[in-house]
Amino acid sequence: HGVVSYAIGNWPPPWGIEYRVDGLSSYVLILVSAIASVVLPYSRASIAAEIEPQQHYLFYTMLALCLAGLLGMTVTGDAFNIFVFLEISSLATYVMVALASDRRALLAAYQYLIMGTIGATFVVIGVGLLYLMTGTLNLADMAQRLAPLRGTRPVLAALAFLTVGLSIKAAVFPLHQWLPNAYAYAPSAVSAFVAATATKVALYVLMRYYFTVFGEPQVFARLPMQQMLLVLALAGMFGASTVAIFQTDLKRLFAYSSVAQVGYIILGLSFGSATGLAAGIVHLFNHGVTKGAIFMLLGAVAATVGGTGL
């Protein structure tokens, strides 16, 4: 029934922070909330086998923080608020990956931390450039003020920084190097939750910036974004799928499969059409549900046979 808007602290937008829920954000909210409601009861047995007992409280704390960050990114209508929630969810995810009893999880979490920090830096630079040009952080107000500024170099630079930063967070090929180890060595409950939600919310934010803030003409007319996204999508689809064939561990195999599936979603965006965007949004939900279920299944397999090696 339209857009739901809530002004934090009773400060009306664009002066205050606005929570703004429309059809797309409610769609992603349902995905994240549904996955969390399934992973939480599943995690009880998973962490008992894969995380030291004295660290169980850390897992539940970080899961709650990560969920809060992902939901916040989805509902907020403020550009800097998106960055804050992005960092909250990312920092919680780094800790959850490192909680696994396998020592290789520490290296995986460190790799994720380094690449995630680079991505967050690019995002905040992009937000800073947009604030410099528009004088506002409210996404709806920013979209209106950007209309006469299309084609200016700071705005195009902001578009580039946001694209690279969010592509790292979404594991778009070739910025996916953090993902295979993080998914493979994290506890199964963490792999299931992160694979089903974290990259999907990053893709949602990318869509939100492309089609709500910048607008389609800005994204696809001023820069060769369609061609670039198309090449990266195809490379991810075929490259990651090929690498997955040669994996000897099921969690790593499906981690590379996730990179390929992100390529399918980016392929939909690269068309620059309503049909392509709709296809990407549908597959975003589809991939979140199926990949979360697959990693929960792999956790059950690991608990039964003692591992996920082929």
Could you tell me what each predicted segment is?
Residues H1-T61, A140-Q144:
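Transmembrane helix-loop-helix hairpins at membrane boundaries of multipass inner-membrane proteins
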Residues V38-A48, L65-F80, T93-L310:
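Hydrophobic transmembrane alpha-helices and their helix-loop junctions in integral membrane proteins
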Residues E87:
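Short phosphate-coordinating micro-motif centered on Lys-Gly-acidic
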Residues V84:
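Short, ordered loop/turn segments at secondary-structure junctions
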